[in-house]
Design a protein with these regions (language model features):
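Long, hydrophobic N-terminal alpha-helical segment
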Residues: 1-56
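Structural motif
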Residues: 33-35, 80-84, 146
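Short gly/pro/ser/thr-enriched loop/turn and capping motifs at secondary-structure boundaries
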Residues: 38-40, 63-64, 86, 110-113
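Ordered, amphipathic secondary-structure segments that act as subunit-interaction surfaces
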Residues: 58-106
Length: 163
């Protein structure tokens, strides 16, 4: 298995990602996909320092080019994007299939135009559309900051966005 865990988290790599989730879903490394972070040496260095594991920070296009190598690897990776829109690009538009069909949504901070779903979990209409598209592609979506702290799945919240 090349990907052991799929997560959307606006902080991408931090203590919650690397410690409690790694106990639930063992991993050897992390793949963070975000165009802005991948183009910033400072952000890349910060994410790599925070993980304590082999860490890659790629653009969405980089991931597309390297997806088969990820699938062929014996290394178990967490696949993390900063937002649902990037995850939709990978799972739906690129059609990346790794055998994992559950997407965990972690912290998504309050922003202008976002709807609060729970503590530190808010999404915009555009992000909701991305989650709906991911769901329709056959993925279950759970909102969970930590393994033992879940506020529910996408079906519980999608009505707030007209789905």
């Amino acid at each position: 298995m090349s990907v052991s865990f799929i997560r959307i988290d606006d902080r991408m790599i931090h203590g919650q990602t690397c410690t409690p989730w790694a106990r639930e879903y063992p991993c050897d490394g992390l793949i963070a996909v975000n165009d802005k972070a991948a183009k910033s040496d400072v952000l890349k260095a910060a994410y790599k320092a925070a993980s304590g594991k082999k860490t890659f920070v790629w653009t969405v296009e980089d991931f597309k080019k390297k997806a088969q190598k990820v699938l062929d690897s014996d290394t178990r990776y967490f696949l993390i994007t900063k937002d649902p829109i990037d995850m939709r690009k990978i799972l739906v538009e690129q059609g990346f299939k790794c055998g994992i069909t559950k997407v965990i949504v972690g912290p998504c901070n309050d922003r202008e135009g976002s709807t609060t779903l729970g503590n530190n979990q808010s999404i915009t209409q555009e992000e909701a559309q991305a989650l709906e598209d991911i769901s329709k592609a056959g993925y279950s979506i759970e909102f969970s900051l930590l393994p033992d702290v879940s506020i529910g799945n996408w079906d519980k919240f999608k009505g707030k966005f007209g789905f």
